[in-house]
Amino acid sequence: MAAPRISFSPSDILFGVLDRLFKDNATGKVLASRVAVVILLFIMAIVWYRGDSFFEYYKQSKYETYSEIIEKERTARFESVALEQLQIVHISSEADFSAVYSFRPKNLNYFVDIIAYEGKLPSTISEKSLGGYPVDKTMDEYTVHLNGRHYYSNSKFAFLPTKKPTPEINYMYSCPYFNLDNIYAGTITMYWYRNDHISNDRLESICAQAARILGRAK
C-alpha cells in the first residue's frame, strides 16, 4: 500500500521557517540578523516568482529614460542649429524680422512655435506668446510647403502667432524644412517692413541651404 503523499503550501513553508528562526525568543543582534534573513528571503521569493516581470519593467524603464535623454539632447542640438542658421539667413537676406517655426507634436503638426527669431518683432506679437499657436492646414503657405516649394506673399502670414492684422509687414518669404522621417516639420521665414527686398532667386538659395541643415538636425 502506497504511503499517503504529503504536500506543503507556500504558507506552511513560510511559517515553518519563521518558527525555526524565532522560536528561542532571541534578542539584540541575533534577532536583527534573523529579521534581515527573513527580509532577504522575502525579496528572493518575489524575484523568483516575478523575475521576468521585474526584468521587463527594468528594461522598459531604462529604455524610456535613455529615449528621453536622447530626445532632450536632439532638441537642444536642433535649437542651437536653428539659431545659428537663422542668424546667417537674417543677415544674408537683409530681412527686418526672421523666424524659425517648428511644428508639434512630431509628424502631426497641430501647433506651431517660434523657436528662434532675429530682428524686431511685429507689433502684434508678444515675446511671451511665441508658442502653441494652432496650425491651419488649409492655408496656402502650408499646402505649398507640403509639396516642398517656397512661398512668398505681401498679405498672408499663416504662422505668425496672432489673429490681428499686421499691416507693417510688406513682404514675407518662407521655405519648409523636413525632418529625418521626411515629414514637413517647420519653416524658415523672413519678413520685411519696407517695400524693398533682395530678389526671390537669392532668397531661395539662402533659405534652401538653411532648410537642408535644419532638416538633418531635426
UniProtKB/Swiss-Prot annotation:
Disulfide bonds join 175-207. It is a single-pass type II membrane protein. The chain crosses the membrane at residues 35-49. The keyword Transmembrane helix applies. Residues 1-34 are cytoplasmic. Keywords: Cytolysis, Disulfide bond, Host cell inner membrane, Host cell lysis by virus, Host cell membrane, Host membrane, Membrane, Signal-anchor, Transmembrane, Transmembrane helix, Viral release from host cell. GO terms for molecular function: pore-forming activity. Residues 50-218 are periplasmic. This is Holin. It comes from Enterobacteria phage T4 (Bacteriophage T4). The lineage of its organism: Viruses, Duplodnaviria, Heunggongvirae, Uroviricota, Caudoviricetes.
